[in-house]
UniProtKB/Swiss-Prot annotation:
GO terms for molecular function: coenzyme A binding; monoatomic ion channel activity. Residues 1-135, 184-190, 241-273, 327-343 are cytoplasmic. TACAN means movement in Farsi. Homodimer. Forms heterooligomer with TMEM120B. Interacts with PKD2; TMEM120A inhibits PKD2 channel activity through the physical association of PKD2 with TMEM120A. Residues 157-162, 212-222, 295-305 are extracellular. CoA binds at K130, S187, R188, Q237, Y240, Q241, H283, K332. The keyword Nuclease does not apply. Induction: Up-regulated during adipocyte differentiation. This is Transmembrane protein 120A. Changing H196A: Reduces its inhibitory effect on PIEZO2. Shifts its ability to interact with larger CoA species (S-ethyl- CoA and acetyl-CoA). The gene is Tmem120a. Disruption phenotype: Embryonic lethality. Conditional knockout in nociceptors decreases the mechanosensitivity of nociceptors and reduces behavioral responses to painful mechanical stimuli but not to thermal or touch stimuli. Adipocyte-specific knockout induces a lipodystrophy syndrome with insulin resistance and metabolic defects. Conditional knockout in embryonic fibroblasts increases Zika infection in embryonic fibroblasts infected with Zika virus.
Length: 343
């Protein structure tokens, strides 16, 4: 005797009942999630207000300590110094706390993104975003090496040059946005290494608008060769800095949100000093580019405003990069000599 054929509608109804039960569980989970989210928002506001109040009181205390310090007896100086050190340590703790709290965007992020909260709430999310930023820099650096080599040795076309300069504009614009988000999330990027990306964005934009002509052709090969060298040095820096940062983070000597930079910082002194000749050569090449452009601007046949407008950013990049790197090297030598004298 054959069994009755299955009832398709009955199966559908039974599946629907299962879905209904699951949906009720989802609704309850979502309700709890929204309650926790409201609690989290209140905690964030309370924590932010408490930190703001305590930072204000710390500033007032620091002013009082500064005023009374000259009149303190010698036996009280050690206690005053200890108090000052504790206050500085407290400021560092506040910096770490604020990395997990919503904050107002700076002017640049407000102009680009509006008043969107870009603070990531977990260590995993922060580290994943930082790691993705580092990979983005690495991949784009390799692409820029290939394209600059192609434009320099294989193709001599203003169209491909324009595409290369457009890529540079997009790359530096993207870096400035991502770095601003990382700063909001606790990355400690030094001021110049952020600002020089804005200068590079402006420079690449002017290069993009420079029309083909005698002045452009005189500077073209020099610029493409410089771009190739600069991308190569950036690749070297990423490769060696990432390994050095990994070791220092494992030893607890660097912050988890520290980034690779296109320059030299004090933490690179151990193991990365071999990069200094490459960096200084690149800095002086920027100066050479600026001087070349200023000489071209004096040519009677020069009619393009882009010549001078490219020369000034190259000069600014040289001054900023050279003196920032030189200051780090000088401070490191000074601290080493001071340490040797103590020994």
């Amino acid at each position: 005797m054959q069994s009755p054929p299955p009832d398709p509608l009955g199966d559908c109804l039974r599946n629907w009942e299962d879905l209904q039960q699951d949906f009720q569980g989802i609704q309850e989970t979502h309700r709890l999630y929204r309650l926790k989210l409201e609690e989290l928002t209140k905690l964030q506001a309370n924590c932010t207000n408490s930190i703001t109040r305590q930072k204000k009181r710390l500033q007032e205390l620091a002013l009082v300590l500064k005023k009374c310090r000259p009149s303190l007896p010698s036996e009280s100086m050690e206690a005053a110094q200890e108090l000052e050190n504790q206050m500085k340590e407290r400021q560092g703790l506040f910096f770490d706390m604020e990395a997990y709290l919503p904050k107002k965007n700076g002017l640049y992020l407000s102009l680009v993104l509006g008043n969107v909260n870009v603070t990531l709430l977990s260590k995993q999310a922060k580290f994943a975003y930082k790691d993705e930023y580092e990979k983005f820099k690495l991949y784009l650096t390799i692409i820029l090496i290939v394209i600059s080599f192609t434009c320099r040795f294989l193709l001599n076309s203003r169209v491909t040059d324009a595409a290369f300069n457009f890529l540079l504009v997009w790359y530096y614009c993207t870096l400035t946005i991502r770095e601003s988000i990382l700063i909001n999330n606790g990355s400690r990027i030094k001021g110049w290494w952020v600002f020089h990306h804005y200068v590079s964005t402006f420079l690449s934009g002017v290069m993009l608008t420079w029309p083909d002509g005698l002045m452009y052709q005189k500077f073209r090969n020099q610029f493409l060769s410089f771009s190739m060298y600069q991308s190569f040095v950036q690749f070297l820096q990423y490769y060696y800095q990432s390994g050095c940062l990994y070791r220092l983070r494992a030893l607890g000597e660097r912050h988890t949100m520290d980034l690779t930079v296109e320059g030299f910082q004090s933490w690179m002194w151990r193991g990365l000093t071999f990069l200094l000749p490459f960096l200084f050569f690149g800095h002086f090449w920027q100066l050479f580019n600026a001087l070349t452009l200023f000489n071209l601007a004096r040519d009677p046949e020069c009619k393009e405003w882009q010549v001078l407008m490219c020369g000034f950013p190259f000069l600014l990049l040289f001054l900023g990069n050279f003196f920032t790197t030189l200051r780090v090297v000088h401070q490191k030598f000074h601290s080493q000599q001071h340490g040797n004298k103590k020994d």
